Amino acid sequence: MNKIILTSISIIFACNSILGQTTDEKYSEDVKSVDAIIKAYYDVNSGSSSDPWEFERDTYTHSKNAHIILLDENGKAELVKLEVLQNEFRMSERKDSYEKELKRKVSQFGNIVQVWSAYEIRYEPETSTNIRGLVSIQLHYEKGRWWIDSWTNQMESDTNFLVSDFLKEK
C-alpha cells in the first residue's frame, strides 16, 4: 500500500514539474543563440502528421509585434500576423512535412542580426524535393535572449530561381 501511495505521489510530482513549466523554462534553450533560434524556427514547422503543432514554442521565439511577409511568385507582398498564420495551420489537416535548411548567411552588428536562409520542404525526412524557398529573418538580442522581429519568405518557382542563385553564392 505504501509503495502505491509513494508511486502515485512521485507520478503527480513528475507531471507537475513537466506540465507546470513556464514557457521560459521549456524554451529558453531555443533563444540562447542565433543558431538555436533558427533551428527552433525550422523545428516548429517540421514533423509528421501525428505530431502536434508547436504554436507555443513558435510564439515564444517571436517578438510581440513580429512582422511576417509572404511574397508570391510575382513578388507581391502580403503582411500576415503570426496568430493568423497559426490559425490557418490549426484549421488545416497536418501532413508530414519537414523543413530542411540548405544554406545560411548571417550578418551581425551589435544586437541586430540578419539571416538569409535557403530551405526545402520534404515529405519524408531523408528525401529531397524541389520545393524550396528563401527566407530573410531579422533578429534582435534583448534581456538575455534572441527574438525574431520579422521574416520575409518567397518560394522558388519555374520563373524565379532565387534558391538556386543563393546556393551558388560564396
Annotate the PLM regions.
Residues 79-81, 126-129, 157-165:
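A short, polar/proline- and glycine-enriched secondary-structure boundary/capping micro-motif
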Residues 132-162:
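Short beta-strand edge/turn micro-motifs at domain boundaries
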Residues 19-55, 60, 168-170:
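Short, low-complexity N-terminal intrinsically disordered segments enriched in polar/charged residues
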Residues 30, 68, 76-125:
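Surface-exposed, charged secondary-structure patches
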Residues 45, 62, 119-121, 152-153:
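Short beta-strand segments enriched in hydrophobic/aromatic residues
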Residues 1-25:
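Bacterial Sec-dependent N-terminal signal peptides
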Residues 41, 56-58, 66, 115, ...:
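Hydrophobic pocket/interface hotspot
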Residues 49-77:
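N-terminal, post-signal-peptide region of Sec/Tat-exported proteins
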